[in-house]
Regions:
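Class I S-adenosyl-L-methionine
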Residues: 1-158, 236
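C-terminal target-recognition/interaction regions appended to catalytic cores
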Residues: 114-241
Length: 241
């Protein structure tokens, strides 16, 4: 929604559809991810409007900027998480706290996948990929194929020994020489997806699914605390009865 400051005209603006579904389903709690730009001053009216709509539907709303790297994901990926809890539930939700340890580096995360095709340089590469990666972006239908982002992002990937202009279909072979590219499976792992997770479609479609996704470890941390809040309410209602 806020990535290019296109607001309501952006094809990625899903808030109207979300509001419609919330009104129809009336879930106990809601969790929505958005880009960091959602918190900028230019979107103040938009934020207030969203909060007002959710209040009319019977929800208390809060949002916070969370970094995926604080929850074990090996990339920066700062994202705004919007949480709304239905009014008939006790306000027992607490935001999750960061893990006490640093996330793994790109090299630590991907060394086995880089070596899967027999590439003899995988371990050396992993030692050089000694930091977390920049934010993985999925783009939209208006943008090109599966690259790792704009020029600045590709330069950041280059410092980690990754060519970001496109993706490989498979891991480097035994005699590969040069700077490797990521596969969709590698990108999925960097995004926090378990290896057994299945994606559908060709490479570009799969990459967009992964890049536009909410990292599962962050989603789990927030959802776990929401579940606790719901349990507190249920327990409260039983005792009150």
């Amino acid at each position: 929604v806020a990535g290019k400051q296109l607001g309501e005209k952006d094809e990625r603006n899903l808030f109207p559809a979300a509001i419609r579904l919330i009104d129809e389903i009336k879930p106990k709690a809601i969790m929505i991810e958005n880009v960091r730009g959602f918190l900028s001053a230019v979107f103040e009216d938009y934020r207030n409007g969203l909060k007002s709509q959710l209040k009319k539907l019977g929800y208390k709303t809060d949002w916070r900027l969370l970094n995926a790297s604080d929850f074990g994901v090996p990339q920066l990926r700062p994202r705004v998480v919007i949480v709304a809890v239905r009014d008939d539930y006790v306000d027992a939700f607490d935001w999750p706290t960061a893990l006490p340890h640093n996330p793994p580096t790109v090299g630590e995360t991907l060394v086995d996948l880089m070596a899967a095709g027999g590439w003899r340089g995988a371990k050396k590469w992993a030692k050089g990929a000694d930091d977390i990666g920049p934010t993985i972006v999925g783009g939209s239908k208006k943008h090109g194929g599966p690259d790792l982002g704009p020029t600045r992002a590709r330069k950041a990937w280059a410092t980690l020994g990754v060519e970001g202009k496109s993706l490989f279909n498979e891991a480097p072979g035994a005699d590969f020489v040069g700077t490797p590219r990521l596969t969709t499976r590698m990108v999925a792992r960097l995004q926090g997806f378990p290896d057994e997770w299945q994606f559908h479609g060709k490479k570009t479609t799969t990459y967009r699914q992964i890049g536009n996704a909410f990292p599962p470890p962050v989603a789990k941390a927030v959802a776990t605390n929401l579940k606790v809040a719901m349990s507190v309410q249920k327990h409260f209602l039983v005792r009150a009865a």
